[in-house]
Amino acid sequence: MAKHDLHLTRNIGIMAHIDAGKTTTSERILFYTGLTHKIGEVHDGAATMDWMEQEQERGITITSAATTTRWKYAGNTYKINLIDTPGHVDFTAEVERSLRVLDGAVAAYCAVGGVEPQSETVWRQADKYNVPRIGYVNKMDRSGADFFEVVRQMKDVLGANACPVVIPIGAEESFKGVVDLIKMKAILWHDETMGADYSVEEIPANLVDEANEWREKMLEKVAEFDDALMEKFFDDPSTITEEEILRALRAGTLKMDIVPMFCGSSFKNKGVQTLLDYVCAFLPSPLDTPAIVGTNPTTGAEEDRKPSEDEKTSALAFKIATDPYVGRLTFFRVYSGKVEAGSYIYNTRSGKKERVSRLFQMHSNKQNPVEVIGAGDIGAGVGFKDIRTGDTLCDEDAPIVLESMEFPDPVIGIAVEPKTQKDLDKLSNGLAKLAEEDPTFTVKTDEQSGQTIISGMGELHLDIIIDRLKREFKVECNQGKPQVNYKEAITKTVELREVYKKQSGGRGKFADIIVAIGPVDEDFTQGGLQFIDEVKGGNVPKEFIPSVQKGFQTAMKNGVLAGYPLDSLKVVLKDGSFHPVDSDQLSFEICAIQAYKNACAKAGPVLTEPIMKLEVVTPEENMGDVIGDLNKRRGQVEGMESSRSGARIVKAKVPLAEMFGYVTALRTITSGRATSSMTYDHHAQVSSSIAKAVLEEVKGRVDLV
């Protein structure tokens, strides 16, 4: 790819709540940019971007498909790498890793539903990765559609500085098009060409005053970011040119000070071309984003890499997928330098050089072979033997580790076994491949029962895994009841001396440590082990201290109550002693593991459970039943409000253990009139009666609490 093209490259994603019409919008983008000749509809199960069979059956997007397309705007041809992301909360890992490699995003909303719970989650994820975005209010043709109400909700709920750049012409059945407030023209779409043709006309007389009013509001907003514009705005707003407005809106969007707002009806083929024009106008190119910062694994120093093909190569693997034809496909974003087909590239995690046999740019799940993927671009490669999501790929002579992605721990598990013993190998092979693709899906063997336990982000997540085992790996499974992924914590600090001694003829083993073990400090927010070395005078030699730390890190994976992991732990190594012959690294590691077990048992161990944030939208007359049911489930109602449609919104925090089968129960209570959505919020300590019940089930004993 020629270097100057980077100005004309856009790496974008469409992010939203489930059912806001993301996939339909992506389909229209592919149709209007000429990549597909027939529009695939989600409700027919034919959408190009939803390529897994389960997605086509369920009408939701599970894996984020990456597609490269082109669009002409203002005399230039722009290259758009479009990533379609799922809106269901069970698939937040897909959203998280997409946002990590994007430069900009389109936040899509339903004109009726507005800002929904998953919209908030995704918005926070985009804030975390500093992704500039524009807003698109979809489904303007639906009954109850209200563009301005969604703009207000964006301000109130998300704290976004939402700024309409278009206003709708009509709404619901009469939605025909938009008024572009920059050009001050009406854009009307024609049904007979499926929206491919549209006309630019004068603003309808009944909308002129409203358009002038909204244009003035837009000018006032953008003038805040540009002193020269502010002057013109107060002197004579009519002298402000189109170029000046575009420049100021782009600057405000890139700084994340403003969110330009658009609207349309993707399903009815209206509004998508305007959206594409302004994706090119306002969202950043790879050159607008700061140089990527990474760590040199040799020196530990921070280094940055600019988005140029002349720099040393750095790329981040953000997704791994298994393709039936080419095998394992690794999707990556190249930040600097270039990756060439047939070349070798170094993986800083594995410390190995790997040959990239072939490179592709993707159109949904079809591969278009390319020879090179340069800085600022997204593509997929084949040939990697040992690769994981979040790995950094670079030149061997210039190693760098880019910040990887953080994924939440799975919250729900089920036991699985193949229906026939001969499928055992197929099952473990299938599970290993699926775990490789999805960092929020884990597989482990229960030490006591020997069962295989798979864990994920929710019931739908695990349903789809079971479904994929059946379709892709031809393994039928029996599955157990869902289990909650509890964790353990300690509540007190305990000081303890641990001595590990072993004499078995010849050289023995010896380690001696004095440690204080307790909850982490309040300002230690990253989780994991907070390890502090206070040993004076070499009583424990420096080379053994990492072994003590490693011992505690290993031990934290199994708590003393029921073998559930600890999220965080503070260990202060105060003193100890060693033997000049018998002490070695393994002795100190084993000594630390023993110290952990003995100290945690005395440090007030408790069980914690996942608490979910629940939102239920229900008719007024079912409110009492819904709240009564939540109370039975140990739920805490945190608030109630009215929606625009007259329904009531109930917000609550409820333990996941009480929520299995909730969707069916809610349907029964409200005769199918209520909907709910649930996201993980935090882990909280369980009461002693529940802890006893869990321990009885897991351990067959309750004397530990």
Curated annotation (Swiss-Prot):
Keyword Protein biosynthesis included in the entry's annotation: yes
InterPro entries: EFG_II, EFG_III, EFG_III/V, EFG_IV, EFG_V, EFG_V-like, EFTu-like_2, G_TR_CS
Cited Gene3D superfamilies: 3.30.230.10, 3.30.70.240, Elongation Factor G (Translational Gtpase), domain 3 (3.30.70.870), P-loop containing nucleotide triphosphate hydrolases (3.40.50.300), Translation factors (2.40.30.10)
UniProt region (Disordered), positions on chain: 293-312
Limits of the tr-type G domain: 7-287
Entry keyword annotation includes Protein biosynthesis: yes
Protein localization: Cytoplasm
GO annotation (BP), single: ribosome disassembly
Gene Ontology molecular functions: GTP binding; GTPase activity; translation elongation factor activity
GO terms for cellular component: cytoplasm
Keyword set, alphabetical order: Cytoplasm, Elongation factor, GTP-binding, Nucleotide-binding, Protein biosynthesis
Record's compositionally biased regions (Basic and acidic residues): 302-312
Top-level division of the source organism's lineage: Bacteria
Binding site for GTP: 16-23, 84-88, 138-141
The protein's role, per its UniProt record: Catalyzes the GTP-dependent ribosomal translocation step during translation elongation. During this step, the ribosome changes from the pre-translocational (PRE) to the post-translocational (POST) state as the newly formed A-site-bound peptidyl-tRNA and P-site-bound deacylated tRNA move to the P and E sites, respectively. Catalyzes the coordinated movement of the two tRNA molecules, the mRNA and conformational changes in the ribosome.
Family indicated by similarity: Belongs to the TRAFAC class translation factor GTPase superfamily. Classic translation factor GTPase family. EF-G/EF-2 subfamily.
NCBIfam families per record: EF-G, PRK12740.1-5, small_GTP
Protein name per UniProt: Elongation factor G
Organism, scientific name: Phocaeicola vulgatus (strain ATCC 8482 / DSM 1447 / JCM 5826 / CCUG 4940 / NBRC 14291 / NCTC 11154)
Lineage start: Bacteria, Pseudomonadati, Bacteroidota, Bacteroidia, Bacteroidales
Gene coding for it: fusA
